[in-house]
From Swiss-Prot:
One of its GO terms (molecular function) is hydrolase activity. SMART domains: Lactamase_B. This is UPF0173 metal-dependent hydrolase H16_A2129. Belongs to the UPF0173 family. InterPro entries: Metallo-B-lactamas (IPR001279), RibonucZ/Hydroxyglut_hydro (IPR036866), UPF0173 (IPR022877), UPF0173_UPF0282_UlaG_hydrolase (IPR050114).
Amino acid sequence: MTRLRAVLLATVIALLGACAAPTPPAEARRPMPAGQPTAGKAEVLWLGQAATRITTPGGKVIVVDPWLTTNPKTPPGFKQLSALGKVDLILVTHAHSDHLGDAPALARLTNAPIYNGGGLGQALVSLGMVPAAQAQRFGKSGTVMPFGPTGPRITAVHAEHSSELALKNPATGKDETHYGGEPVGYIIELENGFKIWHMGDTGLFGDMRLIGEVYKPDLVLIPIGGHFTMGPQEAAIAVRDLIRPRFAIPIHYQTSPQLSGTPEAFKAALGAGAAAGVIVPQPGEKVDF
């Protein structure tokens, strides 16, 4: 009888533990691209639209454009902001709701600073959405080192887009539009020298060539959906003729009917002889570099 009671008690404890424990998002990982070093790798996790989590070789976690909780492409396991785990830095490319998204809530949850181009941070502070100490402002071409001289280096660069902040004022409940700073992209240079250009939202512009020549990004995360940004044809011109990175991950597509561009159309426009390797992860899939 004592043994039966012990077995029943152990079973109950196990069931209660299973109910109490949160279910982590299922992990999917793509093999490292050929030719990449196995030491000092970086991890890129795309979560739909422009939302991206980058884990650096030194263990820093940088989240870009975290629109997650209402993003139809974000996997269910990542719609809880706590599923992102540790966050050291938040980058916002511009003020539109599908990019600013959950950044203020994530900043409050993790105490991570939000870096943004131009005046978006001041608007967030004045609206009471972000503490002033967490709203870090810098300008295009002004490289910053949030983690000190040996950590990742962040440079804001031009993006051909807009950046109005349209929202319901949390204090008044009224719909308002505020200045959202300048739209930017980010060159993120990791501790091992690997460079990522997260382009945010942008149309095609000629200085992509100059940015590519100056910063020499290894990887671009490039919008291909069209309507509000480059479509597949323009994105192919940017990658093949202007930037010439080693790798390209298409983003900002198929989230709404207007964003009709597809990775297949992007690859077809690039052509078979393109130097850049196109990687098409599913939302929630990790890619190592």
